[in-house]
C-alpha cells in the first residue's frame, strides 16, 4: 500500500510539474531565413491561421575557426516587421560542439545581443527567447547549466525561456526552462532515404510515443511543412512529407499526450511551404 501511494504521488507530481507553467494556447510558426521580409502570401497566412507567435531565428552560435570560443553567425537583418498583434520570440541556434565545455560568459553575451538587436530594430513585443540545440547525453549537463545562466540573465527582463526538444532527448531529464518545443521532424537517417522519409516517418516516431506522457515539461508541438532537396551522386532528390503522414503523426502524438494540441508550430514560414499544402491541411495541423 505504501508503494502504491508513493507511485500515485509521483504520478500526481509529474502532472503538476507539466501544468506548473501552462503554455498559452495558440498557433505559431518558425521563421528561419536570414532576412525578415514577408510577402503578401506570408502575411495572409499569418492572418488566416490566427498566428500569434513567430519564433524568429536571430543568429546561430558556432565555434570559431580555431575551436576555442563560440561566436555568432548568420545574423538576421530586419527589412520588414511583423504585425503588432504577433509576439516575436527571438530564437538562437547553438551547435552542439559549443556545449562540449562551459563558456562562462556565453549566456550573458547572447542575451545582451538579443536585447541590442531588439532595441536597434524597434522590436518591442518580446516576452520570451528560445534556444535551439541538439544536445546529447554527453553535452546535456553543460547545456543545462548554460540554460540556468540564461534564465538568470533574463530574470530582470521578466522573459520566459524555452528550448527545442528532439525526440531522442525525451529519454533525458527535462531541461530547466519554462517549456519545450518538441521538434517532430528530421526524425530519420538521411543515409536511408530510399527506405524512409528522413523529414518525418511515423515508423521513426512510434518508439518515442510512450515517453511523452511522463515527460515533466510543458510542450508545444512543431511539425514540418518544408521540403528537403539534396544532390545524391549527381541525382536531385526531393523529400516532401505527405499531408496524411503529418496528420497521422499528429493524431498519434495527441492520443498519447492531449496537451500537445494546445500550442502548434509549423516549420517554417515561407511562400513555397505555404503553397505546398492545401488550406484544409493547415486547418487540421493547427486544430486544437
Q: Model-derived features: where do they sit?
A:
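Bacterial lipoprotein signal-peptidase II cleavage site
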Residues: 13-19
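Catalytic domains of carbohydrate-active enzymes, especially glycoside hydrolases
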Residues: 37-64, 120-122, 126
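Substrate-binding cleft of secreted/luminal carbohydrate-active enzymes
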Residues: 222, 226-228, 232-288
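Conserved beta-strand positions in the central sheet of alpha/beta enzyme cores
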Residues: 53-55, 130, 181, 265
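C-terminal motif of bacterial Sec signal peptides marking the signal peptidase cleavage site
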Residues: 9-11
Amino acid at each position: 500500500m505504501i508503494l502504491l501511494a508513493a507511485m500515485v504521488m509521483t504520478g500526481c507530481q509529474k502532472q503538476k510539474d507539466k501544468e506548473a507553467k501552462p503554455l498559452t494556447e495558440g498557433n505559431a510558426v518558425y521563421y528561419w531565413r536570414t532576412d525578415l521580409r514577408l510577402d503578401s502570401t506570408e502575411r495572409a497566412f499569418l492572418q488566416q491561421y490566427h498566428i500569434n507567435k513567430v519564433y524568429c531565428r536571430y543568429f546561430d552560435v558556432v565555434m570559431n575557426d580555431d575551436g576555442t570560443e563560440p561566436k555568432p553567425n548568420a545574423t538576421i537583418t530586419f527589412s520588414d516587421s511583423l504585425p503588432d498583434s504577433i509576439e516575436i520570440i527571438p530564437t538562437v541556434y547553438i551547435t552542439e560542439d559549443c556545449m562540449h565545455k562551459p563558456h562562462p560568459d556565453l549566456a550573458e553575451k547572447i542575451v545582451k545581443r538579443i536585447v541590442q538587436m531588439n532595441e536597434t530594430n524597434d522590436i518591442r513585443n518580446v516576452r520570451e527567447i528560445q534556444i535551439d540545440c541538439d544536445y546529447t547525453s554527453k553535452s546535456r549537463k553543460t547545456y543545462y547549466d548554460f540554460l540556468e545562466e540564461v534564465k538568470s540573465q533574463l530574470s530582470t527582463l521578466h522573459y520566459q525561456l524555452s528550448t527545442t526538444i528532439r525526440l531522442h532527448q525525451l529519454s533525458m531529464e527535462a531541461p530547466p526552462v519554462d517549456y519545450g518545443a518538441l521538434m517532430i521532424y528530421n526524425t530519420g537517417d538521411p543515409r536511408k532515404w530510399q527506405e524512409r522519409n528522413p523529414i518525418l516517418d511515423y515508423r521513426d516516431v512510434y518508439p518515442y510515443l510512450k515517453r511523452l506522457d511522463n515527460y515533466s515539461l510543458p510542450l508545444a508541438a512543431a511539425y514540418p511543412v518544408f521540403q528537403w532537396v539534396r544532390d545524391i551522386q549527381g541525382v536531385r532528390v526531393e523529400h516532401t512529407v505527405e499531408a496524411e503522414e503529418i496528420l497521422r503523426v499528429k493524431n498519434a502524438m495527441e492520443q498519447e499526450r492531449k496537451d500537445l494540441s494546445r500550442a502548434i508550430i509549423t516549420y517554417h514560414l515561407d511562400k513555397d511551404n505555404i503553397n505546398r499544402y492545401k488550406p484544409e491541411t493547415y486547418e487540421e495541423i493547427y486544430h486544437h
